[in-house]
Amino acid sequence: MPPVAPAVLPPVSVSAVAYWNVLPAAKTLAERLAAVRARIQAAAERARRDPAGITLLAVTKVFPALVIGEAYALGLREFGENYVQEFAAKAPAVRNLAGARFHFIGHLQSNKAALAAELFDCIQTVDSPKLARRLEAAGRQLEVMLEVKLSAESAKSGADPAALPELIAAVRECPHLALSGLMTMPPWSDDPEAARPHFRRLRELAQRHGLSGLSMGMSHDLEAAIEEGATCVRVGTALFGARRKA
């Protein structure tokens, strides 16, 4: 395959780049990407799965458009963002990148649904019939996933598993929304294996409702997620480093 030409992006000020610890000196983005892909490959082999069936979603929240452009030049095409207004500021610089797709993976308030539908190709965090109807009203074809809350943490968003039949029915009544699967965010733990029961439960819920897409797993626990059936892993820190001031 011929090399991908570098993305053409507006200049970014030195102060903007210096503010974020974008690419720690220990490794380049290319090296980090190779390491993440190797982890995905190894986990898929252990699970006797085809790694081509696993999407690497590069989570670029809080990083400038310049970073998206560099990741794109290295072959990444799927990007995740958590904040509508933040991505609205970056979108003019990146929405014209051929083949790039942008996923919303944060909590989406219904009053921002119209703007989110305009900016993103996939909304992974639909958690209520009301939000589904707001996205439908935007009149744009969208891929959607349903966020499921599988823990008792009050800070976590998502639909209760018992509410899934009603939510699935509501989404399927929306002609502009294409339902592709389920998404979850387990409670944080230093032990990657602590997330496995949550991943397994999401897979079982997807199977019960005839859905194939599973967005689960992040930088520290992607192996467990893949072994439990993830079709999309959301990776930020392992690619771009910690999101912190320099």
Residue positions per predicted region:
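Conserved alpha/beta-domain cores
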Residues: 2, 9-220, 226-228, 240-242
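Gly/Pro- and small hydrophobic-enriched strand-loop and loop-to-helix capping segments
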Residues: 230-246
